[in-house]
Regions:
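Phosphate-handling active-site elements
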Residues: 55-62, 90-100, 118
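N-terminal beta-alpha supersecondary unit
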Residues: 2-73, 256
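A residue-level signal for conserved active-site and pocket-lining positions in enzyme catalytic cores
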Residues: 74, 89, 174, 205, ...
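DPxDG-like acidic metal-binding loop motif
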Residues: 68-96, 102
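Stable alpha-helical structural segments in soluble proteins, enriched in small hydrophobic residues
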Residues: 53-57, 92, 110, 204-212, ...
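Acyltransferase
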Residues: 192-256
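Surface "functional belts" at beta-alpha junctions
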Residues: 2-6, 29, 35, 41, ...
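Residues at secondary-structure transition points
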Residues: 37-45, 76, 80, 84, ...
């Protein structure tokens, strides 16, 4: 299994782009990674879980160097929740933000499970986007860092072959909830090894550490979600999420 870096920075990271809720922390003396139920629960559960993790680690907001969040693509409500909370907490504590590609979180978790020795590999990611579509991407791990081969996109399952292997080279590993949609297309029998991923928190934290080391931090106002799919109107629940996580309210959590 891949290991976290020992670094002087203290980072808080969380992701609510899927049905799971992931929260992680690292600081010079250690790290914590937690995965639990998200989805409709995420908007109410995220801030309490963050505060619980901070308390368990014995950290204050002033001890943090940056806040990372899964920027998407993914579920609308989940992306709004994570982005609003990240911005609110960061502004309240005067911290920068590290936006992390949510599909790359899946790729990093799959890589750690299929190539724990850090060997180079390509990973194709497909996440169920509902409505018969997928959020898909392809990434390349060179043994030290990630590169984007095919950027995240919204597509039909039938469109995956040219996306995943435009050069004829099949990615060595596939991962994501969208793989369940592939048998209906007749593609499943031709696909390479598929990997289940379930430790998003640790994968997110490793990516946050890499982003921090590479100077990927931005001001809170510049940290935006990546949706890929347009949406005309918000549901009542989504409007409630936005109201709950507006900056002043969320910033108050920093002082709690």
């Amino acid at each position: 299994m891949a290991t976290l870096r020992r670094m002087s920075a203290a980072l808080l990271a969380f992701d609510t782009s899927t049905e799971a809720l992931s929260v992680a922390l690292c600081w010079p003396q250690g790290h914590l990674a937690w995965n639990g139920e998200g989805g409709a629960q995420a908007s109410a559960a995220l801030v309490p879980r963050v505060r619980a993790q901070m308390a368990q680690a014995g950290l204050r907001w002033a001890d943090l160097d940056a806040i990372a969040f899964g920027r998407g693509p993914g579920a609308f409500t989940g992306l709004r929740t994570a982005c609003a909370v990240a911005q609110g907490l960061a502004q309240g504590a005067g911290l920068p933000v590290l936006p992390v590609d949510s599909l790359l979180i899946v790729a990093e978790d799959a890589r750690a499970r299929s190539a724990p020795d850090g060997a180079p590999c390509d990973v194709g990611v497909a996440m169920d986007a509902r409505m018969g579509e997928l959020y898909a991407a392809r990434y390349r791990w060179d043994g030290a860092r990630w590169a984007v081969v095919c950027a995240p996109t919204l597509c039909a399952p039938e469109a995956l072959p040219p996306l995943w292997w435009p050069d004829g080279a099949v990615p060595a590993v596939l991962a994501g909830t969208g793989l369940a949609l592939l048998p209906a297309t007749g593609l499943a029998c031709a696909l390479p090894r598929q990997t289940q991923t379930d430790d998003r928190a640790a994968a997110l934290l490793r990516l946050a550490q890499a982003a921090w080391a590479d100077g990927g931090a931005v001001e809170a106002a510049q940290a935006l979600p990546v949706y890929l799919r347009d949406k005309v109107a918000l549901t009542t629940a989504e409007r409630a999420v936005q109201a709950t996580h507006r900056t002043p309210a969320t910033s108050a959590a920093v002082g709690g």
